[in-house]
Amino acid sequence: MAVTQAVLPSFSNFCTNSENMKFEKGFLDLDSKDLHQSPASYKPSQFLTDEHQDDSEGCWDMEFLLSDWASMSPERSNSQNYTPQRPTLQDQLHSPDLYQELNAPKPNRHQVCVASSLAELLPPEATLSSSLPPDLQFNCGFLDQQAAKSYSQAENPQQFSAFPVTSNVNRDSSMGKMGKSWDFGHYYQPAPLISFPDSKFVQTQGITMETVVFPPHHHYNFIPSYSHPRLYQQQANYVHRPPPQSHFPSTQSMVPDSTVPPAGLESKRIRRGLVKRKATVHSCEYPGCQKTYTKSSHLKAHLRTHTGEKPYHCTWDGCGWKFARSDELTRHFRKHTGQKPYECLLCHRAFSRSDHLALHMKRHV
């Protein structure tokens, strides 16, 4: 208060000298009776006469208020350039002597904004529109909107996660801590949320993508009998399952596998032949005889030699030969008939037995 009294004299000195009061053009008295009239009925002379009627109301010395701010340039009107010796504007505006008349209720709402002339010189944080009554703020549309925007941003500085709103005074300190990362476009993002099928959200702070367990993907079975498999190419992760095995033998087992090379087939055939030969080998069971035959008929004929049985008899008249084998009987019968079916191609000689022709062919060689 001592500093305020040293800077601002009492208002009684301002109001007694009406000659020192200066009014801007277009200033209207708050108690003027002609405000209810139409705008066309006003005259410039009425403004001057109505302004000098009420000398008891509080008034401002505009020259004195503007004298402190006239030496300051608009560039130095920011809040961060205040000098510590000069009293702050907040102490000047909230002094009880200054607002004893402004806080009084006014019957008329049509008032002119006095702070419009000081808005260009005063900093935006200390404009008069933030301290005036609602009636004065109604007329100060543009200044109130600008102040409201700045105050609304200051009330919720954490509204934006990327760039918090700070004042000009704290900008240097805040930029030193967090502003270096903003120059490169890096900022802290809130932890994202992952939704699960049970409509619950889990915050992923401290959880990496490797630890998150996702629900299993659905696999689609391929339809083998479908004639257009291209329609299923857009699906993902096909799983081809073999058909169920039935108890009955299928025809697919009889078809040789196409993936096996031909060499493998030949080896299989050779092995199968060896197995068959080993399985069809017939050996003589007579003691001391080790002969083997691939046919059972041949083995029977061999056993007849051991037993002496001769079941085949010659039917030629006067001949009673008997034979143990049928081929022996046929050769014997050709002697009676004189038939020689085997003939040499080189010398045209005929033979009744095939083995005799084979011996003859060796002579020509």
Swiss-Prot record:
Region span, Disordered: 243-264
Source superkingdom: Eukaryota
Ranges of compositional bias, category Polar residues: 247-256
Gene knockout outcome: Morpholino knockdown causes significant reduction in expression of embryonic alpha globin e1 hbae1.1 in 22 hpf (hours post fertilization) and 36 hpf embryos.
SMART domains: ZnF_C2H2
GO BP annotation list: animal organ regeneration; cardiac muscle cell differentiation; cardiac muscle cell proliferation; cell dedifferentiation; positive regulation of gene expression; primitive erythrocyte differentiation; regulation of primitive erythrocyte differentiation; regulation of transcription by RNA polymerase II
One Pfam family of this chain: zf-C2H2
Subcellular location, record wording: Cytoplasm, Cytosol; Nucleus
Zinc finger (C2H2-type): 282-306, 312-336, 342-364
Keywords: Activator, Cytoplasm, DNA-binding, Metal-binding, Nucleus, Repeat, Repressor, Transcription, Transcription regulation, Zinc, Zinc-finger
One MF term in the entry's GO annotations: zinc ion binding
GO cellular component terms given for this protein: chromatin; cytosol; nucleus
Induction description: In adult heart myocardium upon injury. Repressed in embryos by microRNA miR-144.
UniProt tissue specificity: Expressed in cardiomyocytes.
Alphabetized PANTHER family for the sequence: KRUEPPEL-LIKE TRANSCRIPTION FACTOR (PTHR23235), KRUPPEL-LIKE FACTOR 1 (PTHR23235:SF145)
Function recorded in the entry: Transcription regulator. Plays a role in erythropoiesis, binding to promoters and activating transcription of embryonic alpha globin e1 hbae1.1 and microRNA mir-144, in erythroid progenitors; perhaps acting as part of a negative feedback loop with mir-144. May coordinate repression of genes controlling myocardial differentiation and mitochondrial metabolism with positive modulation of cell proliferation genes. Required for regeneration of the myocardium after injury, probably acting by stimulating renewal of preexisting cardiomyocytes in adult hearts.
Family: Belongs to the krueppel C2H2-type zinc-finger protein family.
Protein name: Kruppel-like factor 1
Species of the source: Danio rerio (Zebrafish)
Lineage: Eukaryota, Metazoa, Chordata, Craniata, Vertebrata
Name of the encoding gene: klf1
